[in-house]
């Protein structure tokens, strides 16, 4: 699962990421765990920028889990239409609100096991909530983290959960949330799927990727 990335290399990696991205922040705008949960559900197959255009009005109208639980599907679909897959997302938001009300007293739960019982919530979304709302060390694996982890030799699998485990094994627990978010931002802006910016990459010396471009 891990392809030879040592503890010393992990330390160097985190040092370089801290230099490159000293203040990693979640791009999705939110003020509460419920808002971040909703925004993360909406972000599936959608840009964070687009979600951030939709959520101010949405959050003004839907303030509690009960508001989502009792939402009119047609109205909610219209409000989130621009995020794509709006029918499925509206259905998940309504069902999610209903589960929060019926099982969790309207509050976003604080454990992985509980979070992944919510409609539309997988490990990635759960880890976003745990790490950013509740201070629980959590490794978020999205398409950017997956790509960077594979290119750096941190993991040699396509399975997100296995990549999560691989990163947990090689990175200090205290750095899971911050480090995985730095990897995400590095993948988004530097280690791109197409036209990676290898010549500007601080991680170049650590990178064993055969496809990397000359510095």
Please report, for each region that a protein language model flagged, where it lies by residue:
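Catalytic cores of DNA base-excision repair glycosylases
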Residues: 2-215
């Amino acid at each position: 699962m891990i392809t030879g990335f040592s503890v010393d290399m992990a330390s160097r990696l985190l040092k370089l990421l801290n230099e490159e991205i000293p203040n990693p922040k979640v791009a999705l705008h939110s003020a509460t765990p419920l808002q971040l949960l909703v925004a993360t559900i909406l972000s599936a197959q959608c840009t964070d920028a687009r979600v951030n255009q939709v959520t101010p009005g949405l959050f003004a109208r839907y303030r509690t889990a009960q508001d989502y639980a009792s939402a009119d599907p047609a109205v909610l679909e219209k409000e989130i239409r621009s995020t794509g897959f709006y029918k499925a997302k509206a259905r998940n938001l309504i069902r999610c609100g209903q589960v929060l009300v019926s099982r969790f007293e309207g509050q976003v739960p604080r454990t992985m096991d509980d979070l992944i019982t919510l409609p539309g919530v997988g490990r990635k979304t759960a880890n976003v909530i745990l790490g950013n709302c509740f201070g629980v060390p959590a490794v978020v694996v999205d398409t950017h983290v997956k790509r960077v982890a594979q290119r750096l030799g941190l993991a040699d699998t396509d399975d997100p959960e296995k990549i999560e485990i691989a990163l947990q094994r090689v990175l200090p627990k205290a750095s899971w949330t911050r480090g995985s978010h730095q990897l995400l931002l590095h993948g988004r802006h530097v280690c791109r799927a197409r036209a990676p910016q290898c010549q500007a990459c601080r991680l170049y010396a650590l990178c064993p990727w055969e496809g990397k471009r000359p510095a």
